[in-house]
Structures are given as C-alpha cells and as structure tokens.
C-alpha cells in the first residue's frame, strides 16, 4: 500500500570520512545509530557540504562523532511529515564539532523531541548550537566556545526548549540569543567572555530564566531583555572608588536585587558583605577595610538568581 516506509535499525560506526562531499546523510530513518565516526571534511568551491545530515528521521542517536572542516553545518537535523509528533526522541550527545563554515549543530523545524547534550562545539563559522522553527529540544551541559556568531541561538520555536548547565565562552556575538518564540527554561548556564552581550532575549515568551552566571562579556549590559514578562535587563554594577580607608562599597546595580562583595585573599574568595538594591538602583555594602591592590568581586543578582559581576581593585 502507498505510505512512508522508513529505513529501520541502521548503524553507522567507526568510519573515517574525508573529502569534499557530505559525510553521512540519512533520510526517513527510524532508530538509526551514528557512533564513533571521524569526519575531516574539505570545503568545496561550489558546493556547501555537511558533516551529518538527518532529514525526517525518528529516534536517531548521534554520539561520540568528530566533525570538522565542512563548508556548511556540522550536524544538521530537519523534520518534515514522517517525524511529525513522533514519540521517539533524537539524541545528539558527546560529539566534537569544530571549524565548520556554518553552525556547529543546527536543528530546523523539529517536531520530534531532541536532546543535545555534552557536546563540544568550537571555532565554527556560524552559531555553536542553533534551533529554529521547532519545539521540544533539551540543550544540556554542552561546551560552546570561540564561534563566529552566537554561542546558542534559539528562534521561532513553539515551546519545550530547555537550556541548562552549558558553558558558553568567547563567542564573537552574544553568548545565548533568544529571538521571537517560546522557551521553557534557561538555567544554570555559565556565560562569559563573549564579544557582545551575555544573554540577548528579545520578544521571547519564556517561562523561567534563573541561576545563570553572566560575566566578562563585551557589553556592560550583560543581560538584555526586551518585551519579556518577569525578566528585565541586567547591567554590571558600577561602584564608587574603593580605597584602603573604605568601609563600604557603594554604587548602582541596574536590574539587580542584591549585591554581594567578595575579596580574593591568599588565593581564596572571601565574602565581605551583601546588601539589597533600592528602588533608585543604588546599593551600599558594608565591608572591613582592605589592603591596597586587593581585588574585589562585585556580584549583582536579580530576583531569580541570575548573576553579573565586575572586579574592582582597592586603591
């Protein structure tokens, strides 16, 4: 009879793949496994190749692969009719993707649930992890660094997006960029030394953003939130001059709820004090006098535990 007949139970394992074409292509697969393959591709002059391409596939596991050198995306998933509303989850885990011309890991129009976990994505030409126009993706415990666009980019999603426990470091644009769409949670991520903002959230229908550490990014407005319920932008604290005679640290913390001061002494961080931020965005934290050249870390947290910080040296 006329219907979709998927290819079931395919395993692609322990292959060395190189050259100018695509690495591995799967279409209409069911429970395929792609494990321990090494793909060192070359960029063709007229063709945009991909490392691993899974189109309209259910229950696919892509684990422990190394992908580098493609002109386009490293690992690409795209859903159509067969995967729609599938109960079989896709797994993209413990892969290393680097030096691709496009995004490192890109999921587009996803309707089947996917788990993107413990991958390393570095030095790619696009964003490290990109989810566009889909739903049901968990992005957990990945290391995303030194990519030419955003670290993690989410846009036009319809819900069920969870971003937890990722290290997002030294990307050329923002650390995490959330565009228009629905996102469930962004929690427990460490986002630092990205060239622009740590988190950029614009018009996102988001349930929870909490306990993220956002520091040393290029923009003093570490977290930008526009047209988002519950969430406001957060800037680094700005303090008055701190000297050896100072008995408090005073300044402003736009978007902060509390400010805590730590001192780096004998190789250890010591908490000196905490204060609430008032309605004028001002704070005063009482401290003991500190020695000259002591480095103080000023940490501002919002109501949901999202923390931004700045260092000051005692004069």
Which positions does each model-derived feature cover?
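Ser/Thr-rich low-complexity repeats and stalk/linker segments
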Residues: 231-315
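Solenoid scaffold repeats with emphasis on beta-solenoid/beta-helix
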Residues: 5, 9-10, 31-33, 59-60, ...
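Hydrophobic loop/turn residues within beta-sheet-rich immunoglobulin-like superfamily modules
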Residues: 110, 157, 288-290
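Acidic, glycine- and Ser/Thr-rich low-complexity intrinsically disordered tracts
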Residues: 182, 187-193, 202-235
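Low-complexity, intrinsically disordered tandem-repeat tracts enriched in small residues
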Residues: 26, 32, 59-60, 67, ...
